[in-house]
């Protein structure tokens, strides 16, 4: 139970950067919150899979091991997909990608890095708790 609570709290803390503005052309003028990463279908499914893998006891232990990782990777993919698809119409696909990278606030990168670090933190906590329970 202690491990489940710790992993849940760490995951929720890793989502804090999404509460800040991550996309836009200028601070205070046009800002898009990182919450859109969680409200798209991939983000919603990723969060559900993460918590399902932690809190639901499946018959096969591999499912409990895999679901949180799938959820964490899903959050990262959700962030990257939103980066590349949020909206500035352009004349070509290449211009659209240039616009996306030029109109990202630093908190996007902070959130992305924290999401990647979360995978390693999760693995460390999971290994340490498993070692202690044997």
Positions of PLM-derived features:
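N-terminal signal-anchor transmembrane alpha-helix
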Residues: 2-34, 39-47
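Membrane-interface helix-boundary signature
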Residues: 3-7, 32-42, 57-68, 98-104
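Alpha-helical membrane-associated segments of multi-pass integral membrane proteins
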Residues: 4-14, 94-128
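Alpha-helical transmembrane segments of multi-pass integral membrane proteins
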Residues: 9-20, 74-82, 114
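Interfacial non-cytosolic loop connecting adjacent transmembrane helices
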Residues: 24-41, 80-109
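Hydrophobic alpha-helical transmembrane segments
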Residues: 40-54, 112-114
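Loop-to-transmembrane helix junctions at the membrane interface
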Residues: 53-83
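Membrane-interface capping segments at transmembrane-helix boundaries
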Residues: 63, 123-134
């Amino acid at each position: 139970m202690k491990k489940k609570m710790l992993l849940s709290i760490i995951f929720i803390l890793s989502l804090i950067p999404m509460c800040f503005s991550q996309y836009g052309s200028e601070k205070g003028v046009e800002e898009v919150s990182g919450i859109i990463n969680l409200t798209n279908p991939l983000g919603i499914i990723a969060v559900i899979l993460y918590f399902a893998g932690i809190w639901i006891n499946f018959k096969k232990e591999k499912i409990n091991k895999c679901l949180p990782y799938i959820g964490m990777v899903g959050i990262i993919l959700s962030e990257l997909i939103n980066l590349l698809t949020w909206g500035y119409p352009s004349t070509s696909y290449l211009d659209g990608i240039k616009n996306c990278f030029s109109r990202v606030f630093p908190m996007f990168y902070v959130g992305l890095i924290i999401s990647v670090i979360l995978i390693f933190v999760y693995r460390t906590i999971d290994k340490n708790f498993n070692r202690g329970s044997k």
